[in-house]
Curated annotation (Swiss-Prot):
This protein's UniProt keywords: Cytoplasm, GTP-binding, Nucleotide-binding, Protein biosynthesis
GO cellular component: cytosol
Pfam families linked: EF-G_D2, GTP_EFTU, RF3_C
Species the sequence originates in: Shewanella sp. (strain W3-18-1)
Database matches in InterPro entries: EF-G-like_DII, EFG_III/V, G_TR_CS, P-loop_NTPase, PrfC, RF3_C, RF3_dom_3_sf, RF3_GTP-bd
Family recorded in the similarity comment: Belongs to the TRAFAC class translation factor GTPase superfamily. Classic translation factor GTPase family. PrfC subfamily.
Subcellular location as annotated: Cytoplasm
Protein name per UniProt: Peptide chain release factor 3
Gene that encodes it: prfC
Gene Ontology annotations of biological process type: regulation of translational termination
Amino acid sequence: MANQDFLNEINKRRTFAIISHPDAGKTTITEKVLLFGNALQKAGTVKGKKSGQHAKSDWMEMEKDRGISITTSVMQFPYGGALVNLLDTPGHEDFSEDTYRTLTAVDSCLMVIDSAKGVEDRTIKLMEVTRLRDTPIVTFMNKLDRDIRDPIDLMDEVENVLNIACAPITWPIGSGKEFKGVYHILRDEVVLYQSGMGHTIQERRVIEGINNPDLDKAIGSYAADLRDEMELVRGASNEFDHAAFLKGELTPVFFGTALGNFGVDHILDGIVEWAPKPLPRESDTRVIMPDEEKFTGFVFKIQANMDPKHRDRVAFMRVCSGRYEQGMKMHHVRIGKDVNVSDALTFMAGDRERAEEAYPGDIIGLHNHGTIRIGDTFTQGEKFRFTGVPNFAPEMFRRIRLRDPLKQKQLLKGLVQLSEEGAVQVFRPLDTNDLIVGAVGVLQFEVVVGRLKSEYNVEAIYEGISVSTARWVYCKDERKLEEFRRKCSQNLALDGGDNLTYIAPTMVNLNLSMERYPDIEFAKTREH
């Protein structure tokens, strides 16, 4: 029987990620969430990229230059009696693979929508990934300090496009220059908005009760409009149902403005009250419960060079069960070795601290000297592998060339490390000495060349290559696989993990090969 202190620690944890379309305000909301968690005294303004005042969660050099979040940061802070782990994900559309993998390490998600634009395509893609595990979703309709679309239309769009029921928790009163605040439906109170309070926590100005005459004094004719609107909203929308939320079937909807620092506390209250505590995890042999005494965890991301002064890499691990203690012995299942871990890290977006202990739901960082890969499982001796950390087939390809041919060794080392980290995928064709780089979006190519130069002192350039797509190939029959390998060697390559991959010049070529070799499986995704 697990002891009560251990259970209390698990029950306190809330681990979530923010998902949104680029520019819906995700980085701003991350800042404000941290401000409420007292993790930041003054939220970093995201606008001021050139003024040297960078957002706290965008800390890699390239992100600071560009003003976009490229890699996942992890931030832990206390709020309302809970301990919240926020995983910030790349907002830029070219970094979707890293984002997808991060979603495997959380128990719930906050979806941020630009209320002027509604549901956008990146949000649709990310929601598809959360659907793989029926992750509970909290929704924040952002940018109420601008003119927005009709709130009922916005909720209809979420329901129809994303196929999830909406239950409004707060309701906006006006928008843009006329934004007055929100009505909290469950608490029956109006919270009034003050502009110009973006960097400090606003003093809460609350009027209790929708029929309170003080409301008419405070917001004039908007009070009568609100009462009429609420009659309509109550009749037309869903009530919040906690069980449906936990199944990923219904999302509570909050309205506010992250830039104006308004409504963010409502979201955090909702996450602490309703979002699931650390959930059980599937492995290839059994389901692992968080309150099991023995430690287990899996690696969902590898980040190179978090400390520019040191050429190090850190593996981000989600703790799934048991308790991490400094100096403990862990079993690295893939390579079958025991390791002593005395220097795991906790994070506050690039500021590291040594972790004394960690519990299920927490994210810790392990120093990685090249032995840890994405998807690796760590236990206290038991042999199993956590499942559900996917690799996605790249959609774009380039051949990479050196300006200085003598640096081939450094180039390969850099590319292999970057591929293990998940920044890019590397393919080595069986029949040539080419190196092919595959990515989900163009910006990843730029990032790789930039990092090869700054971290490995290698100047590389890209050339176009006629590759349309890649598929990992498997076959239960060794003989048939060997025959396929012999006959199709000009289209085969090994990826960074030495997995056999089919490199298709066109979709027509891929379809023909699939017809010709029905016993070979051509896979779009691969478990790490």
